[in-house]
Design a protein with these regions (language model features):
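P-loop/Walker-type NTP enzyme "switch/lid" segment
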Residues: 1-50, 105, 109, 154-157
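Alpha-helix initiation/capping motif
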Residues: 7-8, 30, 34, 87, ...
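Structural signal for conserved beta-strand scaffold positions within catalytic alpha/beta enzyme cores
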Residues: 17-19, 116, 143-145, 164
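Hydrophobic pocket-lining residues within nucleotide cofactor-binding pockets
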Residues: 22-24, 31, 119, 146, ...
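Conserved catalytic-core segment of NTP-binding enzymes
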Residues: 49-144, 150
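Short glycine/proline- and charge-enriched loop/turn segments
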Residues: 159-161
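Single conserved hydrophobic/aromatic residue that forms the stacking wall/gate
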Residues: 163-172
């Protein structure tokens, strides 16, 4: 009954990764027409719980059926934001969707925290946005940030994990 059989790759000892692929993209199309579509990931993950201590689901920056499935299957969500206007509106939308999934479908997901991406500590605007996030969201904003780095785009372009990027400087 699974939309597609998606096979994880072993990345490091005790770490498997299910990279983005055309099969994964096609899954969303199939999921949209499947009854009980919001619960598909939950069912798959229940079958994997004994194999893994933790399962991390990296979602696209959308609130489509894959993200909804991830929220329904998860205990916690960590929300990345680059701090721009649309990302801030996206945080409002994800709060709304989480509330809706809780009320309508019994989701148990809780927000663990937020972190900034594309962050440049030397740029006043980024520092101001981060301070604004902390004012709005409080202690749930992680100290950890993902800096603005060309290596991130290069790894995505080369379809490889940043950790396995061809350039050693990209792994710093």
């Amino acid at each position: 009954d699974r939309p597609l059989e998606l096979k994880p790759l072993t990345w490091l000892d005790r770490v498997d990764v299910l990279p983005a692929s055309l099969d994964l993209a096609a899954t969303e199309v199939i999921m949209n027409t499947t009854p009980g579509r919001e619960f598909l990931f939950r069912e798959i993950i229940r079958g994997l719980e004994k194999k893994y201590d933790h399962i991390l689901i990296d979602c696209p920056p959308s609130l489509g059926i894959i993200t909804q499935n991830a929220l329904m299957a998860s205990d916690f969500v960590i929300i990345p934001t680059d701090g721009n206007y649309f990302a801030m509106k996206g945080i409002e939308k994800i709060h709304y969707i989480i509330g809706l999934l809780r009320r309508k479908l019994g989701a148990e997901v809780r927000i663990l925290g937020y972190f900034m991406t594309k962050y440049n500590a030397g740029r006043k605007l980024d520092v101001d946005i981060r301070e604004s996030l902390i004012e709005t969201l409080g202690e749930s904003v992680f100290e950890t940030t993902i800096r603005n780095n060309v290596a991130l785009g290069e790894a995505q372009y080369n379809a490889c994990l940043l950790y396995t990027s061809p350039s050693p400087r990209d792994r710093s």
